[in-house]
Amino acid sequence: MTAHWKENHKNLMLFSGRAHPELAEAVARDLEVEVTPMTARDFANGEIYVRFEESVRGSDCFVIQSHTQPLNKWLMEQLLMIDALKRGSAKRITAILPFYPYARQDKKHRGREPISARLIADLLQTAGADRIVSVDLHTDQIQGFFDGPVDHMHAMPILTDYIKDKYDLSNIVVVSPDAGRVKVAEKWANTLGDAPMAFVHKTRSTEVANEVVANRVVGDVAGKDCVLLDDMIDTGGTIAGAVGVLKEAGARSVVIACTHGVFSDPARERLSSCGAEEVITTDTLPQSTEGWSNLTVLPIAPLLARTISEIFENGSVTTLFEGDA
């Protein structure tokens, strides 16, 4: 049996989709459980079949899936897994989405557009999820899209602890890639010894439609070691441009830090050649450092394992990032 039994007979079971099984295995090791065996395959027309190899009746079930490319396939697989657990009489189902898909589509920018992030929450609830766990949501209001508990975890302590251990904080400036991330940058600055802050001012290109251009730095970065942060990096164009602007403003060095390394092409090429000393991310999505010498990947599994443990034991998830009940 892969379950973790307690005296009250509540049963913790961990399940993993096929997108990032290494992450689930790391979480399982920290929890001292095994990932529940599952049969999953694709039919010729692209439909997905899943079946669990053990009874889930009465279990406290945690379903981990990373939403990397092909994102829609892995989202559908997680929904099918949740539905199978619901129909198998699981007691409670927690959907763990380290990277919340469609998070950038959290509101209507123009008429006749969907609010895709809300739809994802509705799909998870309809499938049978009782609770959602995610890490560094693109916007906080996504928590309100799901009609149930949402545990919004933060990778900042993981990233800042690494920076504290490796870099001299006396010369650091925390830089937000735009004005919208300044509040997050403030938290980073407080954690990194009340470091000074700056942000990159962006305007829309007058030459290319729908393109945003980083054009100047607000704040003093001359001679400083800059920590340029964001919640996610996709193609890397904005961040690479920000590195260039910081260098032009006299920054001595630039370190990029993000929770979610989506790294769609041509991100690797851009970020490895933009002049950044290091790119730091976590493994909320599958990562490979092969051919990318300045990429550092930090494990998110310990945070997820502690979160699962607190939920299972009816503890306080808040203590994991605030330090008190």
UniProtKB/Swiss-Prot annotation:
Functional pathway: Metabolic intermediate biosynthesis; 5-phospho-alpha-D-ribose 1-diphosphate biosynthesis; 5-phospho-alpha-D-ribose 1-diphosphate from D-ribose 5-phosphate (route I): step 1/1
Its job: Involved in the biosynthesis of the central metabolite phospho-alpha-D-ribosyl-1-pyrophosphate (PRPP) via the transfer of pyrophosphoryl group from ATP to 1-hydroxyl of ribose-5-phosphate (Rib-5-P).
Organism: Corynebacterium efficiens (strain DSM 44549 / YS-314 / AJ 12310 / JCM 11189 / NBRC 100395)
Annotated positions binding Mg(2+) 1: H138
Entry-linked CDD domains: PRTases_typeI
Assembly and interaction partners: Homohexamer.
GO biological process, one term: purine nucleotide biosynthetic process
PANTHER family membership: RIBOSE-PHOSPHATE DIPHOSPHOKINASE FAMILY MEMBER (PTHR10210), RIBOSE-PHOSPHATE PYROPHOSPHOKINASE 1, CHLOROPLASTIC (PTHR10210:SF41)
HAMAP family named in the record: RibP_PPkinase_B (MF_00583_B)
Protein name stated in the entry: Ribose-phosphate pyrophosphokinase
Co-factor: note: Binds 2 Mg(2+) ions per subunit.
Annotated positions binding Mg(2+) 2: D178
Residues annotated as the enzyme's active site: K202
Pfam families registered for this protein in UniProt: Pribosyl_synth, Pribosyltran_N
Cofactor dependency: Mg(2+)
EC id: 2.7.6.1
Keywords: ATP-binding, Cytoplasm, Kinase, Magnesium, Metal-binding, Nucleotide biosynthesis, Nucleotide-binding, Transferase
UniProt binding sites for ATP: N45, G46, E47, R104, Q105
Upper lineage: Bacteria, Bacillati, Actinomycetota, Actinomycetes, Mycobacteriales
InterPro entries with a match to the protein in the record: PRib_PP_synth_CS (IPR000842), Pribosyltran_N (IPR029099), PRibTrfase_dom (IPR000836), PRTase-like (IPR029057), Rib-P_diPkinase (IPR005946), Rib-P_diPkinase_bac (IPR037515)
Protein localization: Cytoplasm
Catalytic activity: D-ribose 5-phosphate + ATP = 5-phospho-alpha-D-ribose 1-diphosphate + AMP + H(+)
Similarity section: Belongs to the ribose-phosphate pyrophosphokinase family. Class I subfamily.
Cellular component terms per the entry's GO annotation: cytoplasm; ribose phosphate diphosphokinase complex
GO molecular function terms listed in the Swiss-Prot or TrEMBL record: ATP binding; kinase activity; magnesium ion binding; ribose phosphate diphosphokinase activity
Residues annotated for D-ribose 5-phosphate binding in this entry: R204, D230, D234, T235, G236, G237, T238
Gene name of the encoded protein: prs
